[in-house]
From Swiss-Prot:
PANTHER family: PTERIN-4-ALPHA-CARBINOLAMINE DEHYDRATASE. It comes from Prochlorococcus marinus (strain NATL2A). It is an enzyme of class 4 (lyase). Pfam families: Pterin_4a. Keywords: Lyase. GO terms for molecular function: 4-alpha-hydroxytetrahydrobiopterin dehydratase activity. The keyword Lyase applies. InterPro entries: PCD_sf, Pterin_deHydtase. Its EC number is 4.2.1.96. The keyword Lyase applies. Gene3D superfamilies: Transcriptional coactivator/pterin dehydratase. This is Putative pterin-4-alpha-carbinolamine dehydratase. Belongs to the pterin-4-alpha-carbinolamine dehydratase family. One of its GO terms (biological process) is tetrahydrobiopterin biosynthetic process.
Amino acid sequence: MVSLIEKNQLDSFIEKNPSWIIDNKTIKKEFKFENFIEAFGFMSKVALLSEKIDHHPDWQNIYNKVKINLTTHDKGGITTNDIKLAEAIDKLINS
């Protein structure tokens, strides 16, 4: 069973991944690509990752930008699932 992440765990994640921002009960990040096709391709890869992890982002796409917000709605905040997905997204973008 997944539970809310402890503050020290969240602080550690942000320290290692400063491009993710804490916003209330969410972690968020904006990605910028050369064009819409690259942005949409990235979203497709994240969608497949999300299915594999069984945790899905709230996101927005405007042309070459993708904004991702991660939270666990049924827990009312940030959980290990959000951190796991954020790390997987960063690994994907850096590969």
